[in-house]
Structures are given as C-alpha cells and as structure tokens.
C-alpha cells in the first residue's frame, strides 16, 4: 500500500514539474521606462505570435475589449502619479486592456488586478479610457510587442503587432 501511495505522489510531482517547465506558446515579456527622479513605469504582458494569421479584425475583433497580449491580463505598474493620454493615473498597479478598431484604439486602465484577461467584466473598476494613436508599420511584426520609447521627460507606450502600431504618451505628474 505504501508503494502505491509513493508511486501516486511521485507521478503527481512529475506531472506538476513537467507542466511548470513546459514552454509557454506566448512567453512573458515586459517594458519599462525611467521617467527620472526615481519614477518608473513597467508593463508586464505575454507576447503572442502572428503565425501567419490575420490578427486585427479577425483573431482580435474590432470594437471588442482585448487583453493586449495573451494569458494573464497585461499589468501596468507606476511608482508615481503619471499622466496617460491626458488622464491622471495615481501610483499603483493596474490592468490594461484595449479596444482595437481599424483607425482608432482605446486604452482601458483598470484598478482590478490579478485577472486572466477575458472575458472583460470589469467596467465598474475602470480608472480611465484613453484614445490611442494608430499608425501602420512598414513591415509585419511577428511577435506582439509592448515597448516604452523615451521621449523628452516622458515615454510613449506603443503596441506593435501585425502591421499596426497603437501608442499613447505618458508623462510624470
């Protein structure tokens, strides 16, 4: 009987270890920006791949909330108060979502954290909705990428995938 229990425990341990070590199809990634004076922002997300698929308007439908990545919802952490696209965001941890459209995107900054991502049911926890700038990239981007480009005293948070770039300016308050 003890051998059976030891065998079952060993199998559970092995399966748990195998699952934990398995490579995720959409690996974790992050973007950071130093706003100066010890003020920083950090965005943590999972980076899905295009894999020959049509993304916007198909895999990611226009006009619907998208978690801006894969797996867990994308997090946005700021060490101090910032201004995102004209809206004040107090220091803290947030979840960000987007609503993509062909010519206009909306960034949603949400107080609810620790969520998987979709379906979106957190309207009551929204801090702000911000318009994003949208432009076309000259060549397709295979891996969904969030980056913070330093610009003057702030950063431009950009999301690139397929042939689309959505961006918004962030400054320290």
Regions found by a protein language model. Give the residues of each.
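Hydrophobic h-region of N-terminal signal peptides that target proteins for export
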Residues: 11-19
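Targeting-peptide/extracellular-domain and disordered-appendage signature
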Residues: 18-90, 95-173
């Amino acid at each position: 009987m003890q051998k059976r229990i030891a065998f079952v425990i060993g199998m559970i341990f092995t399966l748990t270890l195998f699952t934990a070590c398995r490579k995720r199809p959409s690996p974790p990634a992050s973007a950071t920006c130093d706003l100066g004076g010890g003020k920083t922002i950090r965005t943590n997300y999972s980076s899905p791949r295009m894999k020959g698929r049509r993304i916007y308007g198909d895999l990611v439908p226009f006009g619907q909330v998208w978690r801006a990545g894969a797996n867990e919802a994308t997090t946005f952490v700021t060490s101090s108060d910032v201004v995102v696209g004209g809206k004040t965001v107090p220091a803290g941890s947030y979840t960000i979502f987007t609503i993509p459209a062909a010519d206009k995107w909306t960034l949603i900054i949400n107080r609810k954290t620790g969520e998987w991502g979709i379906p979106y049911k957190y309207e009551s926890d929204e801090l702000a909705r911000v318009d994003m700038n949208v432009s076309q990239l000259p060549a397709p981007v295979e891996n969904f990428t969030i980056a913070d480009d330093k610009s003057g005293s702030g950063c431009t948070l950009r999301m690139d995938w397929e042939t689309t770039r959505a961006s918004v300016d962030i400054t320290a308050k």
